[in-house]
Amino acid sequence: DKFLSGNLCRCTGYLPIKNAIKNMYSYKSDKFSKSKVIRLLKSIKKTDTVIKKNGSKFFIHYNLNSLIKDYQKISNGHLLVGGTDLALEVTKKRKDLKNIFYLGSNKDLNYVKNKNNNLHIGSATPINDILPILENIYPTFAKMFERYGSEQIRNTASLGGNIGSASPIGDSLPVLIALNSKIIIQGKVKKTLLLDNYFISYRKTKLKPNEIIKEIIIPIYKKNILKCYKISKRIDDDISSVFMAINARIEKNIIKEIKIVCGGLAETPKIAEKAQKFLLNKIFNEENINEAKKIIKREFDPIDDMRASKNYRTKISQNLLERFLNENNKIKSTLY
């Protein structure tokens, strides 16, 4: 089921797909062994490549310097890693993308390092390469990625792609903001930006033309609670109606630190500044959460669309605060 999730079928279900896989056992095995295929692939010499056809160019770079050098020369370049968002520009909007820069093979953008209580993640690192480390540090964040996309998607999708596309319902973005993550942007000069300050408006960011996201820096909070709540019509492989991430430190039932970030309630992932300000240094109880629910209702003005109504989104955001209380409050709540 894990590997079939990328073949989600609303008509026939999984059974015919499973039966087809069982029938494959009658076929002859591949003449190549797995180890031999890996060895052959690794033997291919990695040199920067430009594929040209019909006036379009497809760039493949293996280091950051050569990528930046070529990317600075192109005024209409498109960055590609997993392509789950960029591909829609072609299939849905019928755009002709002339200059594509593939980042998935760039060694300077593919890494995960744990140093000085921070995770340093290359912007093109596949989600599945990050999961083993996240499972030990932020298990709820890692668990969220199981619903974020199928195994096939997670093998190519990246955090840099999520941040670059700037979707208001990108599931990783509220979590990264809640964790006070930073990004390193590389262009003619290198700069570091708090992700809170990255978004300007719908699909607009502070990333300038010919700049790329090089690295994501995620602080490691050892004493905090991190919760990731994804609300969607289907459990797996579905776009969120509402997403809420909460990063909090609670000591002796006092909220010493809290950050609440929502996706799907505004044109960008947005911090619930008024609600979290009210809760800071308050007792973690039903009374204060109920007041925060009133505040968050006034703080956001979501839209009606095909995924959810305005009223539904508002109510869900309130309910998620309530859920956070019930999951983490050591003093029994009377809500249920």
How would you describe each model-predicted region?
Residues 1-336:
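C-terminal structural segment of proteins
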